[in-house]
């Protein structure tokens, strides 16, 4: 009786237009960054050092920048409709801007809250009572922030623009199941509104004063020369992160963007 021939399995061949043919190494894209810090720390000044910026202003932070160095900016926002108009103009109309700066998402939050309260026919006293309460108002605010982030993502991907979100800082209590509660600096936003600017950013930078202590015991005093540092690595003191391997504080010098050295998409671009 003849022994049946053993068939060798055929090696699968990739289809010329199959899904696997689309695989490639992703290219560097423009950065998406959130800058956080107390008032007067230089957030707007640093944002103005990104390549050819255009500012969307929910507040006017330009006065800290000398007039001859001020970047281009849209008129101050007076409604959320104006915000969408300005963002859509950058998406649809021809221009040569390379960075969108939104100053600030904290001020946008106030605008969003005011709109939701004003549009509620029941005339709620606060955002907590808006839209029937039970967190619905705050969820609606978070949805508007998500819309901002989505439009910014289109500019980043389609128009190859860097995106800089500016946020004011506030303290928040962190409660973890395996640690005692502790306080850190975070974004001055509702808890549900934070994710678009932290989870979905390449860099979250916290600007702080460089401080030293003098004296001993109860007589210790914090002193500072006024020098500022940009923190972009994970730390318990403040919300911060980066996807570029930065592991130390970055000194901030006037007129110099300390991130250029670390972010490929910023190098060689004016």
Predicted regions and their residues:
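N-terminal pre-Walker A segment at the start of P-loop NTPase domains
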Residues: 2-22
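Conserved P-loop
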Residues: 15-18, 23-102, 106-114
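A general structural signal for short secondary-structure junctions and capping/turn motifs
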Residues: 25, 45-47, 93, 154-156, ...
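Short, well-ordered beta-strand core segments
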Residues: 53-55, 163, 204-206
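Residues that form or immediately flank small-molecule/cofactor binding pockets and catalytic motifs
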Residues: 60, 78, 168, 209, ...
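P-loop NTPase motor core
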Residues: 107-193
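Conserved GTP-binding G-domain of TRAFAC-class P-loop NTPases and closely related GTPase folds
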Residues: 172-270
